[in-house]
């Protein structure tokens, strides 16, 4: 969406007006890191889905994975939000500092648009009445499972976001069993 003045103002207006769960990714997170006063406006139980670089822009660099996880837990607690830190074993933190690690997914999912798919899955789950933490945990798991199914069908090399999308129905069918 970009980080120009109009986009910053639009995000500020959204955060001022929206009282329900908000799911933020990509440039919205970059805007927060450059306009820290907006972080205070995040609605309770909002969900942020940064990759490690976006997260470091929000909280500063970490010396190691343990320190980064501690910063993730503290950020969730300080701002009453869910943080989905995308990576090989995506970590999810809640405001009570609980941590969940995902066991699904594969390196082929590190492709353009994969994070957008994840954000869409989480947003759809929130829209269907799941709590923020449930939507984050289930969304991350289903996204990874769809990626695993896609890798079985097409391989990891050359996987694209639409391969993950095409496997989401099967992933949810497996979940419903």
Question: What positions do the PLM features span?
Answer:
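Short beta-alpha connecting loops at secondary-structure transitions
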Residues: 55-59, 103-109, 119, 123, ...
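Glycine-rich phosphate/dinucleotide-binding loop and adjoining beta-alpha-beta core of small-molecule
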Residues: 1-104
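Short, small-residue alpha-helix embedded
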Residues: 57, 111-142
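Short, well-structured alpha-helical segments that form the helix of a local strand-helix-strand
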Residues: 69-76, 132-146, 161-169
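Short glycine- and Lys/Arg-enriched binding-loop motifs that mark or flank ligand-binding interfaces
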Residues: 24, 83, 101-112, 116-120, ...
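Charged C-terminal helix
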Residues: 147-177
């Amino acid at each position: 969406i970009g980080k120009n003045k109009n986009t910053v103002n639009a995000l500020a207006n959204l955060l001022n007006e929206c009282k329900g769960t908000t799911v933020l990714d990509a440039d919205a997170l970059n805007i927060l890191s450059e306009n820290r006063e907006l972080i205070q406006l995040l609605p309770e139980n909002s969900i942020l889905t940064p990759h490690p670089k976006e997260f470091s822009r929000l909280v500063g660099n970490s010396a190691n994975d343990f320190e980064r996880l501690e910063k993730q837990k503290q950020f969730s607690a300080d701002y009453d939000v869910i943080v989905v830190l995308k990576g090989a074993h995506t970590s999810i933190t809640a405001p009570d500092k609980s941590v969940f690690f995902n066991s699904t997914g594969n390196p082929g999912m590190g492709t353009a648009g994969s994070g957008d798919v994840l954000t869409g899955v989480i947003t759809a789950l929130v829209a269907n009445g799941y709590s923020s933490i449930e939507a984050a945990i289930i969304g991350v798991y289903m996204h990874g499972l769809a990626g695993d199914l896609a890798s079985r069908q097409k391989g990891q090399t050359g996987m694209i976001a639409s391969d993950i999308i095409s496997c989401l129905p099967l992933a949810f069918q497996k979940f419903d069993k």
